[in-house]
């Protein structure tokens, strides 16, 4: 199993319930594909460095998880088509 770090930027118009639902969806995707969530930072609203999809702010969160490469591939596929997600990045941290 490999370690991964994923940063997610969610739409700024989501409420607490929407952010919680998105967190649950991401955690379920990870666990259903053989991975485990090690930690998740709380969602924080921050100003974006530049406009993305006509938005100037977004909710940021970082997920640390372990899984197989197929786990990261499935997350990549699903998050690309998730409307609540503005941008995301999955990386393998330096050992």
Curated annotation (Swiss-Prot):
<dbReference type="InterPro" id="IPR035980">
    <property type="entry name" value="Ribosomal_bS6_sf"/>
</dbReference>
<dbReference type="Pfam" id="PF01250">
    <property type="entry name" value="Ribosomal_S6"/>
</dbReference>
<comment type="similarity">
    <text>Belongs to the bacterial ribosomal protein bS6 family.</text>
</comment>
<dbReference type="GO" id="GO:0070181">
    <property type="term" value="F:small ribosomal subunit rRNA binding"/>
</dbReference>
<keyword id="KW-0689">Ribosomal protein</keyword>
<dbReference type="GO" id="GO:0006412">
    <property type="term" value="P:translation"/>
</dbReference>
<dbReference type="GO" id="GO:0003735">
    <property type="term" value="F:structural constituent of ribosome"/>
</dbReference>
<dbReference type="InterPro" id="IPR000529">
    <property type="entry name" value="Ribosomal_bS6"/>
</dbReference>
<dbReference type="GO" id="GO:0005737">
    <property type="term" value="C:cytoplasm"/>
</dbReference>
<keyword id="KW-0687">Ribonucleoprotein</keyword>
<dbReference type="GO" id="GO:0005840">
    <property type="term" value="C:ribosome"/>
</dbReference>
<keyword id="KW-0699">rRNA-binding</keyword>
<comment type="function">
    <text>Binds together with bS18 to 16S ribosomal RNA.</text>
</comment>
<dbReference type="GO" id="GO:1990904">
    <property type="term" value="C:ribonucleoprotein complex"/>
</dbReference>
<keyword id="KW-0694">RNA-binding</keyword>
<dbReference type="InterPro" id="IPR014717">
    <property type="entry name" value="Transl_elong_EF1B/ribsomal_bS6"/>
</dbReference>
<protein>
    <recommendedName>
        <fullName>Small ribosomal subunit protein bS6</fullName>
    </recommendedName>
</protein>
<dbReference type="InterPro" id="IPR020814">
    <property type="entry name" value="Ribosomal_S6_plastid/chlpt"/>
</dbReference>
